[in-house]
Design a protein with these regions (language model features):
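PRPP-associated nucleotide enzymes
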Residues: 1-221
Length: 221
């Protein structure tokens, strides 16, 4: 089998290779707990120090994505994080989370870092943009594809929920993809945004694409 922790390190390493020479943050951090392993992989590859600018406090709080109300999800996510101001004040941070779904919690986390004195917050999700709702599992509380930040942004950009060229937004070499990423980064107030590419993620996993489900990223069944 594939060791998941080792795979997360490889994902972080691949993100760092794509970033080489483009950003110079002071520290690399992961949103606890989901982004920690990816951030360690990024730090090891890039040579930029790994740090923990906030500590996760979990007693009495459930998983933040589980409540049905967005305001409750945001409150739980915020209350779980305790800032370490000495590691944030005046610093440029590169922040890694496992994914961006709705975008609301990561925007709150970014604002939380700015309020704590961060100079820059570069965001690197450790999975590609989610463009399609999962038709196979019932893991998320999402009830509509328009819950996804990508689809809301595409609608704002094009005026339609289901553009004919939707597949282009899954191609990291396309103008549509890059316009979407730039729009999301500005909307969520990130200094910069770069997603993990699907081809890099498949390489990080180490399993042939034909044996992996990639539907939520590229719509291929």
């Amino acid at each position: 089998g594939i060791n998941v922790e080792d795979m997360r390190y490889r994902c972080g390493s691949m993100l760092a290779r794509r970033d080489a020479g483009t950003v110079q943050p002071d520290i690399v951090a992961g949103v606890p707990d989901s982004g920690i392993a990816h951030a360690i992989g990024y730090a090891n590859e890039s040579g930029i120090p790994f740090s923990r600018p906030f500590i996760k406090y979990t007693p009495t709080w459930p998983r933040s994505f589980m409540p049905t109300m967005q305001s409750q999800r945001n409150l739980i996510a915020k209350m779980k994080l305790i800032p370490v101001h000495e590691l944030i004040q005046g610093r440029s941070l590169l922040l890694i989370d496992d994914s961006i779904v709705r975008g609301t919690q990561l925007r709150e986390t970014t604002e939380f870092l700015y309020q704590s004195g961060a100079r820059e917050v570069h965001v690197r999700p450790a999975c590609p943009p989610l463009l399609y709702g999962c038709k196979y599992l019932n893991f998320s509380r999402s009830t509509s594809v328009m819950d996804l930040i990508t689809r809301r942004v595409i609608k704002e950009m094009t005026g339609t929920e289901e553009p004919a060229d939707l597949a282009k937004y899954a191609d990291p070499e396309s103008g549509e993809y890059n316009a979407m990423i730039e729009y999301i980064g500005k909307k969520l107030n990130f200094t910069s945004l770069r997603y993990h590419r699907l081809d890099d993620m498949i390489q990080s996993v180490g399993i042939d694409k034909c044996k992996l489900c990639t539907y939520c990223w590229d719509g291929q069944e």
